[in-house]
Amino acid sequence: MSSDVVVAIDGPAGTGKSSVSKGLARALGARYLDTGGMYRMVTLAVLRAGIDPADAEAVGRAAQAVRMSVDYHPDGDRYFLGGEDVSTEIRGDKVTAAVSAVSSVPAVRTRLVGLQREMASGPGSIVVEGRDIGTVVLPDAPVKIFLTASAETRARRRNDQNVAAGLADDYEAVLADVRRRDHLDSTRRVSPLRAAPDAVVVDTSDMTEAQVIDHLRDLVRQRSEVAR
């Protein structure tokens, strides 16, 4: 690209946010930051310590003590908790079930937002993915995108992924979990999930991954006057 640009991408799980954000970063020749993985690392640390995710005070203390790092690579990011590679474990069901509760703790968000801003301020263009990037983490980002899709579409996608991974085929259970997480994320007191007023909202329900990436690349060009 001819100049540096910061792209903030928000939205609920199941919108294709992660794969699209990575694809867009590749298309733009930009760095990529998955903030959700950072919340998952804190959640894993909380669970390993035997802390109840609903105990906000204890969760906050754990967040302050945790040591984490992320190595970003085109072929797959690696997440390290205290030097241990936990890239696979943070995607497990136990972490998934607890991450919304842990993420809602103000002390957790305060610590991670600071780290995310530091990471995003580095040289070069960057695509930052999360749930409060355009509203809280990088409110001055020149390009803000909010991906959305119906709960049913997102549940179907996640259930298909589960089946492909050899897990149980249980669409109704997945749909219930999607709706539960949506409620938690949109009603939490600190940094609720919502589109920034100046974000471009893109419904991915009837779009392929490639179509979404192409559309977002065009949006970036329009908003930042950046061309490949």
Swiss-Prot record:
It is an enzyme of class 2 (transferase). ATP binds at residues 11-19. Its main location: cytoplasm. The keyword Cell membrane does not apply. It comes from the Bacteria. Its EC number is 2.7.4.25. GO terms for biological process: nucleobase-containing small molecule interconversion; pyrimidine nucleotide metabolic process. It is found in: Cytoplasm. Belongs to the cytidylate kinase family. Type 1 subfamily. This is Cytidylate kinase. It comes from Mycolicibacterium paratuberculosis (strain ATCC BAA-968 / K-10). The lineage of its organism: Bacteria, Bacillati, Actinomycetota, Actinomycetes, Mycobacteriales. The gene is cmk.
